[in-house]
Amino acid sequence: DFISVEVKDKNAFKDDIALAYLWSDDVQKLRDHMLYFWKEALAPSNPDDIRLILYSEQDENEVIECIKEDFGEFQNVLHEVASADIHLDVALIPPQEDRDYYTLCTIGAGAYRMDIEREIRTQYHLSEYAEYIMYLPSDWKLDNESLMDEANYWPFRLLKNTARLPLWTESWLTMGHTLGTEEGEPYSEEYPYNNSILIYPAPFVATREDKCNLSSGKTILFHHILPITQEELEFKNENGTAALLERIFPKGCDEMDVIISRLKREGIS
């Protein structure tokens, strides 16, 4: 089996064309990968065009299946009504018997390819694609009327702003990166958090990444956004990510209990 590609405009190629040989036990998957990469490479582009960045139907379906498999089944999705760049929906994964909390997960952020320098990408084995999650207490108000109140909506705003930040700033995000509010103000008056750190999804917040390998060849990472205080940010800057996570998640603790307790309103001093 082989793939034949006819290129009519050879001027579109640079002089340093390389030849690569690929072997695979899964010919169908290899073909899908090659077709995806050729389509991306040969697609005409206009720097003045502003187009909506979307998953292919197949990629989106596979991402949704990964979310269901890794984080839980869901029926409700907070759909974005208008999108100027990335179309970002948020899956609402309800509490279950074995997990008394909500999981919010973006659907759409991974359609955007983050701008990571090749040397950094290869040295640290980074993916250029990511989705973002947050965990909320099971009593968080998520009905339409309640989400009109910023006190309930701010986690969604944080998810969406974080997901769009690499596009807005032509940069990239990965585990250990921190983000702050523009004026240093808390995300909500009810909480002391005005910064966030990206960590791995619980329960392996410091040691194991969660990823979704698509048949198109993309690898989508799932980053957990953990709100932190200004003091915790300063501690992290002085001592490093590992030290901060050891402080927030003491040895032997239940990581999810810690995450949820930090967002319980009655537990805020």
Predicted regions and their residues:
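Short linear motifs embedded in intrinsically disordered, proline/glycine-rich low-complexity segments
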Residues: 1-269
